[in-house]
Design a protein with these regions (language model features):
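Bacterial N-terminal signal peptides that target proteins for export
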Residues: 1-9
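Short, surface-exposed alpha-helix to beta-strand junction/turn motifs within ectodomains of secreted
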Residues: 47-73
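N-terminal edge beta-strand
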Residues: 22-41
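Aromatic sugar-binding surface patches on proteins
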Residues: 80-86
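Extended, polar beta-sheet/loop recognition surfaces of beta-rich domains
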Residues: 38-40, 44-51, 109-123
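A glycine-anchored, Pro-Gly-centered beta-turn/N-cap motif
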Residues: 93-102, 113
Length: 123
């Protein structure tokens, strides 16, 4: 029984390493946050992932609730570190907006996502 213990431990460790090697970038934090209701328009969109992303192959698009593109083809830049990317925003009026993003994680996989936030008139 004890002779198999080192083999089982080695197998477990190999499986654990293999699972981590195929992990993709996961969105951990966003500014504005998903489903946020804001009373002041944000100045930028910042997306923070659990691992570094390739800024040159990443894009962020801002759309309104009529699917009109508000911001597109703006150069994405690193914000806080290699895990965070963002774009500056023009002055936004009240309404519902959708952040659509595509990033290339360091493992070579594309990750896409979309979320909304709302700007309410503060009058």
């Amino acid at each position: 029984m004890f002779n198999n213990y080192p083999k089982l431990l080695l197998l477990f460790l190999l499986l654990l390493v293999n699972v981590n090697a195929y992990a993709h970038a996961i969105l951990e934090y966003s500014e504005p946050a998903r489903r946020a209701i804001l009373y002041r328009a944000p100045e930028q969109v910042v997306l923070t992932f659990n691992e570094a992303v390739e800024v040159e192959f990443s894009k962020i698009i801002l759309m309104d609730d009529n699917d009109n593109v508000v911001v597109k083809n703006q150069k994405v830049r690193n914000i806080y570190n290699k895990n965070s990317i963002g774009i500056a925003l023009p002055e936004l009026s009240s309404g519902t907006y959708f952040v659509q993003f595509q990033v290339l994680s360091i493992d070579g996989h594309k990750v896409k996502g979309r979320y909304k936030f709302i700007i309410k008139d503060n009058n």
